[in-house]
Amino acid sequence: MPHLTRRSAMLAAAALPLAASLPAGAAAAQPLQGAAFPAFTRSRLGGFEVTTLLAGTRPMDKPQETFGTNASPEDFAALSQANFIPTDRSLNFFTPVLVNTGAELVLFDTGLAPEGITTALAAAGVAPDQIDIVVLTHMHGDHIGGLTGDGGPTFAKARYVTGSAEHNHWSGAGDKGFDSKVKPLNDKFTMLDDGGVVVSGITAMAAFGHTPGHMVWHLESGGQRMMIAADTANHYVWSLQRPDWEVRFDADKAAAAAARKKVFGMIAADRIPFAGYHMPFPAQGYAEPAGEGFRFVPLGYQLML
């Protein structure tokens, strides 16, 4: 039986008038605001600043129909359970990356629409007309959607860079998004091949498969390195731990799987961080070899020191 001391009895008695004076329901007066993420994170890579920008999120039902089309339901459920994520629902992130080289502001991809990327940039203290270069990793709508809006180009003073094979493919594809978002800017584009240089310290690397000319981009400054991995892996568990699982959006599924193994094999071997467009925000981490694939290790404070 609990023992009531004289001191605890006095404290309880003192609290009674306060409790009586509170209106009914006062404890629930603050409305719930819902789950939220920050709009940006900024870190250092040698002499560069790297800012990830959350341009949007989108929940998805039946994720196996997107991220594991050749996996059995049992295997998909088992891997999901092992990683503490639901089997029947997922959350997709859309995360462009801004690199400040000290001389230029280089933006990788633009999100679904101008509103998402400009809002994230504003939170990071950057205006759209400050962007010097926009690099497009590939031409899917969630990467080119922020290029233009009703008022014209979002990044009025920028020049544009993308892969030659990617631009060539979409130029003849009759794609509405490409024709409306990219073609009007064609005279401002520079096309690069594997090994091409955007500016000093930013180099193109072919990772074809997700699209016919999908590229990743290697950053290096002051002896530090990072990979902008774009859509090489579309999910931090299903695509990384099982690189052979097919993704609905991959144009060439065998080539995409080979690209995942090649790119993340290099990232893991060299122990360098990467930014992945659809990774959980802030969308940066490391790839650790694990069985047939890789385990995503979220970035901590390594680039804050």
Positions of the model-derived regions?
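N-terminal secretory signal peptides and thylakoid transit peptides that target proteins
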Residues: 1-20
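Cap/insert and terminal regions of metallo-dependent hydrolase folds
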Residues: 3-5, 223-305
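Metallo-beta-lactamase
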Residues: 30, 126, 130, 155-206, ...
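Conserved beta-strand hairpin/beta-sheet module of binuclear metal-dependent hydrolase folds
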Residues: 39-123, 216-232
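Divalent metal-coordination and catalytic microenvironments
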Residues: 47, 109, 138, 160, ...
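Active-site metal-binding loops of divalent metal-dependent hydrolases
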Residues: 55, 110-112, 139, 165-166, ...
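Active-site HxH/HxHxD metal-binding segment of metal-dependent hydrolases
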Residues: 61, 89, 105, 111-187
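Histidine-centered catalytic micro-motifs
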Residues: 134-144, 208-214, 276-281
